[in-house]
């Protein structure tokens, strides 16, 4: 047999709670299958979502504080040991009796029997909470607040996973991710210097020529991620090596219509991204793991505002689109439409190897540019 259930609780417009549960016995199988998988499985998940801004005064109507939490558990209990026809409960009973015959206490024998049972089971427990798309929405109608703080969007999430399986006695992984983005649409600041040339031959074709002094939009972002994985294999006496991740990526872009209704009317799109690693900050000079407080002291206000580690990759892209407009002689512009695009890409990578010979062999920078007309 197999069972599945779910329930949902809505808390008006404040949030919701959703829970799901499923369970199946070892012999359950679908109609198109002849046998079950001989594994008893249980799954449980609960999801919570809320909007914390609903508790703020009405003046903070532009504030966004979404929050979510998820807890999930999966438990698999096989009837037989992996890749064999040995019944797990029978093997546990044999181990218990063997320990009793050796003179062990019932508690010690039961501990050995439980180890036999646990070794064949798979247990996964996951937790995650997140706040994504956070906007402060400070209720001050002044450009210094409206165009700075209120244009910032932030997000943070944390997740952790515990696992026990026939392969690992335990594996624990945690990770957090933080991002902050600032985007701004700039008001047009332009001039039209040829409005007087309506009756002038040739030049009059560009009477609506406009020069823009500011980009139309600009955005920048910072993305940081840190995580760690530790595990103990059932086939090794010592724990496996700690897997660490600590990286940052910063990026920016803008789009700028330099001119409009002119001879070329170029539109410049520029973006760059730089990736760096902060993994060297994880360990001190003696190879010991630094605490979060020690790492933060190395990152902030330590000779500079923020230390984002060693740069390992950098990319820049420039795209210029233009639409040539020729003087309107004899109405030819009605039949002519020309476009062009110029692109330039720059890429730089540094393997961050301590061996200079290896570092210099792998480190490289490339520049590619193309021009097309139609």
Residue ranges and their predicted role:
Residues 1-374:
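Exposed, low-structure sequence patches enriched in small/polar residues
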């Amino acid at each position: 047999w197999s069972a599945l259930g779910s329930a949902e609780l809505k808390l008006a417009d404040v949030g919701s709670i959703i829970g799901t549960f499923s369970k199946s016995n070892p012999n359950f199988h679908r109609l198109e299958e002849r046998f079950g998988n001989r594994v008893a499985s249980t799954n449980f998940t609960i999801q919570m979502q809320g909007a914390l801004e609903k508790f703020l005064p009405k003046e903070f109507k532009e504030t966004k504080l979404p929050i979510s939490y998820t807890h999930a558990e999966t438990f698999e209990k096989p009837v037989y040991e992996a890749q064999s026809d040995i019944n797990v409960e029978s093997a546990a009973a044999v181990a218990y009796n063997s320990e009793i015959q050796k003179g062990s206490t019932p508690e010690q024998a039961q501990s050995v029997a439980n180890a036999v049972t646990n070794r064949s089971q798979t247990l996964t427990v996951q937790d995650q909470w997140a706040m994504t798309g956070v906007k402060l929405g400070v209720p001050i109608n002044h450009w210094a607040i409206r165009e700075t703080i209120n244009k910032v969007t932030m997000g943070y999430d944390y997740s952790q996973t515990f696992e026990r399986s026939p392969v690992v006695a335990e594996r624990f992984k945690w990770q957090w991710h933080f991002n902050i983005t600032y985007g701004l649409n700039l008001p047009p600041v332009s001039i039209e210097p040829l409005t007087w040339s309506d009756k002038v031959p040739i030049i009059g074709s560009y009477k609506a020529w406009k020069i823009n002094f500011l980009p139309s939009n600009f955005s920048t972002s910072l993305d940081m991620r840190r995580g760690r994985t530790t595990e103990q294999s059932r086939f090794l006496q010592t724990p496996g090596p700690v897997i660490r991740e600590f990286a940052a990526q910063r990026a920016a872009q803008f789009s700028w219509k330099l001119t409009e209704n002119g001879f070329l009317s170029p539109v410049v799109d520029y973006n760059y991204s730089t990736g760096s690693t902060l993994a060297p900050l994880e360990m001190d000079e003696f190879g010991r793991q630094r605490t979060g407080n020690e790492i933060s002291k190395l990152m902030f206000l330590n000779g500079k505002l923020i230390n984002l580690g060693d740069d390992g990759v950098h990319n820049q892209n420039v795209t210029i689109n233009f639409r040539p407009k020729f003087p309107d002689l004899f109405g030819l512009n009605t039949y002519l439409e020309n476009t062009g695009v110029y692109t330039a890409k720059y890429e730089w990578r540094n393997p961050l190897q301590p061996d200079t010979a290896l570092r210099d062999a792998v480190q490289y920078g490339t520049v590619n540019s193309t021009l097309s007309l139609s």
